[in-house]
């Protein structure tokens, strides 16, 4: 890694914490794109806890096989069947080995067996909802294996929407820049032949300033989010729609600067959770270290409380803010 980068997983991320609170067939699904087309899975976006990274699947064709392989045709179906056979073999092999062990080694193999049982049970649950997956699952297209980054991100949003609608997960993370050294996407599909890192350093392209370029990229992302919202809005759930019971958080690609300290970090929170969140407003908290200043952790506590978790803190407290109460939700967001 280059200076300033870290491969250390110090603790849980907010999506990992929510995954424990809102478990599903897949507690968490991470989908994204990376600079290098050959990157299949990245582990630098999400985590369930210290040194427990969560995968971000960066190839839509492979993500489709993992999520919808039980009802797929061709290669994806073959991969799903092969995965089941492999899990069955490994589970039985671990059981045989475990029976020959004692003490700490037996306990360790018991943990391995539990992991494989979890994976196999997940595959079984996918088989149980095949009708739903066939009815509401996505239809793969050339975008799923396209070398064009915008095609792949479009496909990942399609997969993510289908995963939510089919009940595969309650927690979805979509990333358009996955990988410690592979975040530097060039959005050629938007007609831009300049990478995001160069844009961040203020470079222009053709007749467009760095600000113009960022606006084009961000507008594209919001169009994708709007498409996701429309799909959720079309699904009835309870007395409303899936969108009524969903919160979407758009995290900006940058804080107060290209090489930032994250003292300011703009976010967009979409959805009101059935009226439990106050929406349609712009909120600007006082600057870092000032009276009534709040941290990103306070927003995350807000989300966890909405999900039903009894938490009043998240992550590590900022030692430079020792005189501030860093606990609790953002009351300004709660109805």
Regions flagged by a language model, labelled:
Residues 1-335:
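Ligand-binding pockets and gating/stacking loops
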């Amino acid at each position: 890694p280059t200076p300033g980068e870290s491969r250390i997983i110090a603790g849980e991320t907010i999506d990992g914490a929510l995954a424990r609170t809102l478990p599903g067939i897949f507690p968490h699904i991470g989908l994204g794109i990376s600079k290098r087309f050959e990157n299949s899975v990245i582990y630098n976006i999400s985590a369930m806890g210290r040194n427990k990274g969560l995968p971000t699947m960066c190839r839509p064709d492979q993500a489709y096989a993992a999520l919808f392989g039980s009802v797929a045709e061709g290669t994806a179906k073959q991969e799903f069947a092969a995965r089941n056979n492999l899990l069955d073999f490994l589970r039985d092999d671990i059981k045989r080995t475990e029976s020959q062990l004692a003490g700490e080694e037996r306990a360790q193999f018991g943990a391995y067996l539990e992991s494989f049982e979890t994976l196999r049970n997940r595959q079984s649950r996918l088989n149980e909802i095949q009708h739903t997956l066939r009815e509401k699952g996505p239809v793969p297209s050339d975008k799923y294996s396209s070398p064009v980054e915008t095609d792949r991100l479009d496909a990942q949003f399609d997969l993510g929407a289908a995963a939510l609608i089919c009940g595969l997960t309650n927690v979805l993370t979509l990333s358009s820049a996955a990988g410690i050294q592979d975040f530097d996407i060039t959005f050629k599909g938007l007609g831009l032949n300049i990478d995001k890192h160069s844009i961040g350093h203020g470079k222009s392209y053709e007749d467009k300033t760095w600000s113009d370029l960022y606006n084009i990229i961000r507008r594209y992302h919001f169009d994708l989010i709007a498409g996701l919202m429309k799909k959720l809005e079309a699904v009835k759930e309870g007395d409303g729609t899936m969108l009524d019971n969903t919160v979407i958080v758009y995290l900006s690609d940058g804080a107060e600067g290209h090489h930032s300290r994250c003292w300011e970090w703009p976010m967009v929170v979409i959805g009101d959770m059935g009226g439990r969140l106050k929406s349609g407003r712009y909120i600007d908290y006082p600057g870092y270290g000032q009276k009534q200043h709040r941290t990103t952790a306070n927003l995350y506590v807000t989300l966890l409380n909405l999900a039903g978790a009894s938490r009043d803190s998240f992550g590590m407290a900022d030692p430079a803010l020792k005189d501030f109460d860093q606990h609790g939700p953002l009351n300004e967001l709660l109805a």
